[in-house]
Design a protein with these regions (language model features):
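Flexible loop linkers connecting adjacent transmembrane helices
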Residues: 37-65, 89-99, 111-146, 331-348, ...
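Extracellular/periplasmic helix-exit of transmembrane alpha-helices
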Residues: 114-123, 128, 229-245, 253, ...
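Helix-loop-helix module between adjacent transmembrane segments
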Residues: 31-32, 105-129, 136, 140-173, ...
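N-terminal alpha-helical transmembrane segments of multi-pass membrane transport
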Residues: 1-77, 81, 92-97, 109, ...
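Alpha-helical membrane segments and immediately flanking helix-loop junctions
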Residues: 58-93, 122, 128-136, 140-142, ...
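Transmembrane helix-loop junctions in multi-pass membrane proteins
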Residues: 3-4, 34-39, 82-87, 164-175, ...
Length: 444
């Protein structure tokens, strides 16, 4: 087991500290310039579609979801425990300046996720009365023959293991730990309850999943945003200092408290880009499964909507988490991850902070379980056919129960590894799709 742990750590170090940072950020930069910075040009249209066009909430066809349902299903997966723990880890390891580099990665990532959604729409198929799409479809579209089949199969195996099984174990563990800490409820009992409710949603397929996410995701986001804003109002003088530390720390971390912790510009950049990309999932190949299901007139319309998911995830929710941590003065107390975030909310809400974090963890992690289950399901159908879906659902439910009680350090590291491995075929395909995306964008 020690050998396995070391191998996983070495692979993750190579992938997440070096290779994927360059590839993911590079793909975002290439698409940004190629599409003439579509994340800026179409940002207003995206916001208008998200908040002003009520037809997004309706317009459900027989074969797909509304654009809003597809977006909330994607956000359900994007906004997870990483939005609480991820920002805290980045700040603790890379200093306040890491948040600036999170913004940079998200900015370029918006162009990448636009391309993913456009290609998912362009190459989707009608199967069993529902639209289905994702990286496996556009991988085989752009690469014919054995190479395309190999890349698609490799991606499917990686995402099933990374998200469907191991990733969902980690999410249920976060819920169990949070509720045990706040309410002293046994972790196993929490895991069983989560698994039962999740199983009921799984049985209903994509329609029930979408119906669930379109109701829960706005509530969950609003609850967390209000909680963060309340704390920021209570610590208003610290907000200005927080923004100053973010910008100074991005280029001169030694000039602030982070310098005493040995934080460098390279370290701030590495942790900011890594945690940002991992949280918003731009370029990772997960969210295209959701965006492929939307019934829209033009694939590029859903691409614009997809960009809003990255904006909400990183520029709103992750940023608010970071500001709460920095403005409450808990940075430097020796904690990291969710513990650091929890300390910040305890400063703002007292003992209610534990309860607030537990509720947020429940919403964030549970919706991620639902979203990740569906992404895995699409790939199970691709590899093994419809008959394997029930077996897959049972395994996921078991993983949710087991994950609630385990120490999941190795499981999380393995999920990171397979998550990284699934990015590689997706990025190869996206770079191969550059001319297609550019052509579709010009026509729209």
């Amino acid at each position: 087991m020690e050998f396995v742990t070391k191998v996983v750590e070495c692979v993750n170090t190579f992938l997440w500290d070096y290779a994927l940072l360059v590839l993911l950020l590079g793909a975002g930069i290439i698409y940004s310039f190629s599409l003439k910075f579509i994340q800026i040009r179409k940002f207003g249209a995206g916001m208008k579609a998200l908040f002003g066009n009520f037809s997004l909430h309706g317009g459900k066809g027989e074969n797909g979801l509304s654009s809003f349902q597809a977006l909330t299903t994607a956000i359900a997966a994007q906004v997870g425990t990483g939005n609480i723990a991820g920002a805290a880890t980045a700040i603790a390891s890379g200093g306040p300046g890491s948040i600036f580099w999170m913004w940079v990665s998200a900015f370029f990532g918006m162009a990448t996720i636009y391309a993913e959604a456009v290609m998912a729409q362009h190459t989707r198929k009608l199967e069993n009365g529902h639209y289905v799409g994702g990286p496996v479809y556009y991988i085989k579209y752009v690469f014919k023959g054995r190479f395309g089949k190999f890349l698609a199969g490799f991606f499917s195996v990686a995402i099933i293991l990374a998200l469907g099984f191991m990733g969902n174990m980690v999410q249920s563990n976060s819920i169990g730990a949070a509720f045990n800490n706040a309410f002293h409820v046994p972790k196993l009992a929490v895991g069983i309850c989560v698994a039962v409710i999740a199983g009921i949603i799984f049985i209903g397929g994509i329609k029930r999943i979408a119906s669930f996410t379109e109701k829960i995701v706005p509530i969950m986001a609003l609850l967390y945003i209000i909680g963060c804003l309340v704390i920021l109002v209570m610590h208003l003088p610290g907000v200005g200092t927080a923004f100053k530390d973010i910008f100074v720390g991005a280029f001169a971390p030694q000039a602030i408290a982070g310098g005493a912790l040995g934080v460098t510009v390279q370290k701030a950049m590495r942790f900011g880009v890594a945690r940002g990309l991992f949280s918003n999932e731009a370029g990772m190949g997960s969210t295209p499964h959701a965006h492929a299901t939307a019934e829209v007139k033009d694939p590029c319309d859903q691409g614009i909507i997809a960009m809003m998911g990255v904006f909400i995830d990183t520029f709103i929710i992750l940023t608010l988490t970071a500001l709460v941590i920095l403005s409450t003065g808990v940075l430097g107390n020796g904690q990291t991850g969710s513990e650091l975030a929890q300390s910040a909310f305890n400063v703002g809400f007292g003992n209610f902070g534990n309860i607030f974090i537990a509720l947020c963890m429940l919403f964030f992690a549970f919706t991620t379980i639902v979203g990740w289950y569906y992404f895995g399901e699409v790939n199970v159908r691709h590899l093994f056919g419809n008959g394997a879906v029930k077996v897959y659902a049972v395994i996921v439910v078991i993983c949710v129960i087991i994950g609630s009680t385990l120490k999941v350090d190795l499981v999380w590291d393995m999920a990171d590894m397979f998550n990284g491995l699934m990015v590689l075929p997706n990025l190869i395909a996206l770079l191969g799709c550059l001319a297609i995306v550019r052509k579709l964008t010009k026509k729209s």
